Amino acid sequence: MKIISPDNDSIRYTRRVMPDGDLYFIFNEGNKATEFTADFDKVGVAKEWNATDGTLQPINATIVNNRTRLTIKLEAWESKLISIGKSNREYNIKEYGVKGNGYSETATLQRIINEAVHNGGGTIVIPAGEYLSGALFFPRGVDLRIEKNAKLISTVDPNEFPVIPTRFEGIEKRWRCAFLNFDHSDGVKVYGEGVIDGKGVEWKKIPFGNSGRPRLLCFTDCPGR
């Protein structure tokens, strides 16, 4: 947890990393009430524990730079227990405007991914059918499920695969991005019975150049659980 504003030396906290999210015990050691804004090192849905009935109640949060941002009020000597867990919401791409008509739908797919992040994460679902796309970027908190008889197919267009700072064969360098890119996504899952088709044979016809060809998948700083 990092306090953004205002500076406050009366706040203490402990964090416990759980399989389904993180728990934060936050305590005001001061003798005055305080309000502060803090970033939590997790993308997810924020809830506060109600000490009266033992339930977790949703609280307002925003996602900023791959972290969950909260504004918290604490009375003198008051403590709160905050839970931040990955959303179980699913985003079926067909329900969000993807057509699967043989044309590249990179922008629409990326918009769905970004919407999921904005809402605290979740799972992007690729249903049965064939879907064409350029490079996609999955921020923290977003999983990918490719269902049976579904195929996510790469375009063979260098313009849809920008050259970015990345790591290639253990060396930090500028290189063409992968088809599916996951960055700082702790516990991310890519699963299902469908197919990810990177069109490797077709990409071999594109000159390697100084920036290479796309990889199929790239996980950067993505520790498991």
Residue ranges and their predicted role:
Residues 1-88:
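Carbohydrate-binding surfaces of carbohydrate-active enzymes
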